[in-house]
Amino acid sequence: ITETLVAIGGRRRLVGVTRYCVRPQGLLWGVPRIGGTKNPDVARILDLTPDLVFANEEENRREDVLALRAAGVEVDVSFPRRVADVAPAIRLWGARIGEEEEADALASRIDAELDALHEAPAPGTFRYAYWIWRNPWMTVSDDTYVADLLKLAGGVNVFGAGRERYPAAAPGDSAARGAAVHFFPSEPYPFREEKHGAEVAGLFGVAPRRLFVEGDDLCWHGVRTLEGLRAVRRLRVYAGEDSSPAGSTGPGTPRAPAG
């Protein structure tokens, strides 16, 4: 949310951010930090006397939202779960901070990218697993923003039907379910090809493609959705190339969808 608020002109209005608000890099220097998403310093927030606090239903705790509201602070709680939810959310945020024009411009760009994808020929499908954690290994269900984004590229989530949004799963489970592509994003777990490439090749086998990608582009909604939709375009091409070598990305292999 912070990165998007800055993108639509809200930097000068920011009086505080969590320690996990790291984007846009270089533009948050001097903004007070008010703790983490799960353990914010409510007293510190009140000392900053904000007119409005932005929160996310999944990332922030209900008790902290209620504490702020009880103290008379207005709290905007959002939770975009689908790519189509993002543009309306941006327009709403723009209206809340008096930046309607900039917000509408950004939302319109996202709408245009999304419309172009819908109007393009339907992509072929590929079965995938998107790993968000290691030890224990965890993945995502279809009830997530990233799964909705990858669906636009033709992705079929082999763990999509799970009741939990972020189910635990063993590496062998994905092979049994027919995953042809494994995604290893840079966040929330910091997967890196140079550090984890050999390990995942041993765990997941050499046949499935292994993509180390920028998690910010695929998991973060808001202004980052633009990069996510561009990644979808690249992934449509990548996933459709049958002649590429199997295994992790590298010289001679197709470009990874992001990063």
Language model region names:
Residues I1-G259:
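N-terminal ligand-binding lobe of clamshell/alpha-beta domains
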